[in-house]
Every structure is written in structure tokens, then in C-alpha cells.
């Protein structure tokens, strides 16, 4: 079973507690308003990251992550949207 860590609306704020909170997760899913490329990079360096952009996200994040992210994991259809 895949363990998922879910968050959104970080608005460019990094908190080292994310690492502790998500340490037992296999993937992190971010539902938009990441807020800075640094936050996205740090999350992706820690665990595989699936994300979408939100209304505050700039061009760098919008070019990397879609508005909608739909995929199947372990037979379950998932849609992430901000």
C-alpha cells in the first residue's frame, strides 16, 4: 500500500516539520499554491512529488506542474486540482 502525504497552500513557506510529518510517506501530493520553486524542489528531493499549480503560482511552477493532475494509483483514479 502506497502511503501518501497531502498538502496545499504552502504559499512559499517551508517548514522543516514537513520532513518529519512525511517521513513515512512514499509520495507527496501538493494541491496547488506551492508559492515558490524552492518549496517544490525541497519536497521533490525528499519524496516523489505529484503537484498542480494554484492561482498564486508563477510561470516556473506552471510550466512544470499541470492545472489538473489525473492518474491511477493502485487501481484508484485520482484527480488533483487546486
What are these regions (language model features)?
Residues 1-49, 57-70, 75, 80:
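N-terminal active-site segment of His-dependent metallophosphoesterases
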Residues 52:
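Short beta-strand/loop motif that positions the catalytic acidic residue
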Amino acid at each position: 500500500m502506497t502511503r501518501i502525504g497531502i498538502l496545499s497552500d504552502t504559499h512559499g513557506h517551508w517548514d522543516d516539520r514537513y520532513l518529519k510529518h512525511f517521513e513515512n510517506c512514499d509520495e507527496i501530493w501538493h494541491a496547488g499554491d506551492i508559492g515558490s520553486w524552492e518549496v517544490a524542489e525541497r519536497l521533490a528531493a525528499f519524496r516523489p512529488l505529484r503537484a498542480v499549480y494554484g492561482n498564486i503560482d508563477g510561470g516556473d511552477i506552471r510550466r512544470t506542474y499541470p492545472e489538473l493532475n489525473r492518474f491511477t494509483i493502485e487501481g484508484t483514479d485520482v484527480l488533483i486540482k487546486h
